A protein has these predicted regions:
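Extended, low-hydrophobicity, polar/charged segments
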Residues: 1-185
């Protein structure tokens, strides 16, 4: 079954979560165009291959929700899907103690997102700026970025300039660029 790329929001909100609709509402309010694919839940990068193909040429990102050992600093790391996260390398670049994956309860508390749905668009729910956004430099070089609208049964293709410009400005978040090497084969 070929996935269909649709311009804009769904025609109906039936069966869709409020957080997904809030995402479309905000993108529309900001005048950010997007294309959408609806699909079965995509919880791993491996399950995303067909989605990635349909969203091409977007940089499909792994979005990792991280924290320090004390759980006092939280980070959302956007890296290309073909790269591996090495905590030592990223921790050194941001001058932070060793990072690890943050517990699910903080993901829900700060981003209103569940595992498998982590997305830069979840920053719209982080109104008190608990989360620091880290972006792999290669993601910034892509014309488009692919991400979830706060739910993993849809994926969006947005212009990178809109995400890292209009969207982040509106939600009062900046970002720090990190360099992550391509995984060795």
């Amino acid at each position: 079954m070929k996935l269909e790329l649709i311009h804009g929001r769904p025609d109906s909100v039936d069966g869709r979560l409020k957080k997904e609709i809030r995402t479309y509402d905000l993108l529309d309010e900001l005048g950010i165009p997007y294309e959408r694919i609806d699909h079965k839940a995509a919880e791993t990068m491996e399950a995303c291959a067909e989605i990635d193909e349909a969203l091409a040429p977007a940089a499909i990102c792994k979005n990792l929700f991280l924290c320090n050992r004390q759980k006092t600093q939280f980070f959302l790391l956007m890296i290309r899907g073909d790269k591996q996260f090495k905590t030592k390398d990223v921790s050194k670049q941001i001058d932070s103690p060793r990072l690890s994956f943050a517990p699910e309860e903080y993901m829900e508390k700060y981003l209103d997102i569940t595992p498998g749905s982590v997305s830069v668009l979840g920053l719209m729910n982080d109104t008190e700026n608990h989360i620091q956004l880290l972006v792999d430099e290669d993601v910034l070089h892509s014309e488009y970025v692919g991400c979830h609208p706060c739910i993993n049964t849809s994926s969006l293709r947005l212009k990178s300039a809109d995400v890292f410009g209009k969207f982040l400005e509106h939600v009062h978040h900046g970002y720090q660029v990190v360099k992550i090497d391509t995984a060795e084969k």
